[in-house]
Amino acid sequence: AKENDAPPTYLDPAGVCENSLIADGCDIQGSVKNCILFRGVRVEKGAQVENCVLFKGTVVKKDATLRCVIADKAVTIREGRTLIGDESYPVVVARNATV
């Protein structure tokens, strides 16, 4: 059986969340703008996520920058990484990948 009960999303006082749809169980300590975040996504301090769709369990490490990215389930974006796609051609990261 699937578990559909997650803790509420945590938005750090230093975190930013604008014009985004955020599911339960997320931890947002960085900046999230114009995004869709599925359950259990973590955005660490200093990370910037803009115009992205991040599926369940994705982790964006400290000081990473994502723009126009679609990340499948359980993706890890390493500390300080930059991934920038275009609105017409987003960067797509496969399930369980570490970038």
Question: Could you tell me what each predicted segment is?
Answer:
Residues 1-99:
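Left-handed beta-helix
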